[in-house]
């Protein structure tokens, strides 16, 4: 997960007599706020967008059209979360959700190699534990044929950027010739860009750098 800032003013479609949380102004505003990324898995630029209710509305019109309860999500994460997962971290609040939950992607893409989802640097809480359980399902669940396909595609996307990080790491730690300050600074900046909230799967790269003794010494704190 990644932290974002939600503006207090909400789209007009949520204040009219015929409220619509799927109206274009709502969807476009959420797309901008969340950098076109799923608020759970951090996939970016997916074609099938769902407007997710972090707190399931269960027919409650107040929750259904509450601006602060609407989140940008992919089909996979939205269907897995459903109405059963509650007490989920709100990435629009002050808590650094990327620090709360540690994530690591496997190097091999099959059902037997799981994404590691565990408690990060913050003290545990009901919300953190609930979100860990949900994210573990989002990244690893393959209980239907469609979820096997969507999970494989998701991991492939993560691994694409993971390869970029490993390439930068190699060039930074094992250069062909000694690095001067400018190219070294450029490589470090490339890694920091990957840790920005607008970058796909940014929480993975924060933890990859943080847990790498050599890389973290060069790059510094990325949280």
Where are these regions (language model features)?
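Catalytic cores of transferase enzymes with a strong primary signal for eukaryotic protein kinases
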Residues: 2, 36-38, 46, 71, ...
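C-terminal, charged low-complexity interaction regions
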Residues: 130-223
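Histidine-centered nuclease catalytic patch
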Residues: 19, 40-73, 81-101
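DNA major-groove recognition helix of helix-turn-helix/homeodomain DNA-binding modules
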Residues: 77
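Short, charged surface segments at domain edges that flank catalytic/cofactor-binding sites
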Residues: 1-37, 59-65, 156, 165, ...
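Phosphate-binding glycine-rich loops and adjacent basic patches that engage nucleotide phosphates
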Residues: 31-39, 123-128
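Domain-level detector of nuclease and nuclease-like folds
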Residues: 82-172
């Amino acid at each position: 997960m990644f932290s974002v800032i939600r503006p207090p003013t909400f789209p007009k479609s949520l204040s009219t007599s015929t409220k619509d949380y799927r109206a274009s102004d709502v969807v476009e505003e959420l797309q901008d706020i969340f950098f076109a990324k799923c608020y759970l898995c951090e996939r970016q630029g997916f074609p099938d967008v769902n407007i997710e209710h972090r707190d399931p509305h269960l027919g409650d019109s107040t929750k259904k059209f509450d601006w602060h309860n609407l989140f940008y999500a992919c089909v996979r994460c939205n269907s897995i979360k459903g109405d059963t997962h509650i007490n989920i971290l709100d990435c629009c609040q002050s808590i650094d959700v990327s620090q709360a939950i540690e994530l690591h992607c496997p190097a091999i893409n099959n059902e037997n190699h799981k994404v590691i989802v565990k408690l990060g640097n913050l003290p545990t809480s009901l919300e953190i534990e609930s979100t860990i359980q949900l994210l573990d399902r989002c990244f690893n669940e393959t209980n239907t044929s469609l979820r096997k396909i969507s999970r494989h595609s998701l991991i492939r996307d993560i691994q694409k950027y993971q390869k970029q990080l490993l390439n930068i790491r190699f060039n930074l730690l094992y250069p062909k010739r000694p690095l001067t300050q400018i190219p070294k600074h450029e490589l470090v900046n490339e890694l920091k860009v990957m840790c920005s909230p607008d970058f796909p799967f940014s929480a993975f790269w924060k933890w990859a750098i943080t847990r790498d003794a050599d890389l973290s010494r060069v790059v510094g704190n990325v949280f």
